[in-house]
Design a protein with these regions (language model features):
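C-terminal nucleotide
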Residues: 1-118, 129-164
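Conserved glycine-rich beta-strand-loop-beta hairpin in the small C-terminal domain of fold type I
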Residues: 126
Length: 164
């Protein structure tokens, strides 16, 4: 992504595909400062899958549909609906058990001040992100800082690597 810029989609079958869209949004990244083990989070998800095969299968199908919806929303720069899909994805992550109380609190702060917020990465700790635009960027940052959460904003670079 750093080389090509923009947004990439990945799936096991096709690998990486660049999304031909340049939506105009910011992400506010907030850090829980909770150290976590990806290995133990993955083991927990595996256990959830083994104990809840039907539910896990349904979640995987629902997630595939959600990805298709997100790709469409990105192509038309529909940030508000994209935020709703982010919230929906976070609900799936809650179901499989990769969240905790601090992450839930951070997500709640993010969802109140942005279009949507969710865990990024494996879960269990680390960071969350909130989807914002210019209208709610500073408010979202201030809400996280008011709760003493470290945060910063990022915007997607659509240009990628450039020679000098």
């Amino acid at each position: 992504v750093c080389i090509y810029g923009g947004i990439m989609e990945y799936d096991k079958k096709n690998g990486f595909t660049k999304i031909k869209s340049e939506p105009d949004f910011h992400l506010v990244i907030a850090n829980s400062n909770i150290k976590h083990s990806t290995e133990s989070v993955v083991a927990g998800v595996k256990q959830f899958k083994e104990e809840n095969e039907t539910e896990f299968s349904k979640l995987c199908n629902d997630e595939s549909e959600l990805v298709e919806d997100v790709l469409k929303l990105l192509s038309v720069n529909n940030i508000k609906e994209l935020g709703q899909k982010i919230i929906q994805n976070q609900e799936y992550l809650e179901t499989i058990g990769v969240s905790n109380e601090k992450l839930r609190d951070m997500i709640q702060v993010g969802q109140k001040s942005s279009f949507g917020a969710k865990i990024t990465g494996a879960g269990g700790g680390g960071c969350i992100f909130s989807l914002t635009d210019e209208s709610n960027l500073e408010h979202s940052i201030n809400q996280f800082r008011d709760k003493n959460y470290e945060c910063f904003s990022v915007k997607i670079d659509f240009k990628g690597l450039d020679t000098f």
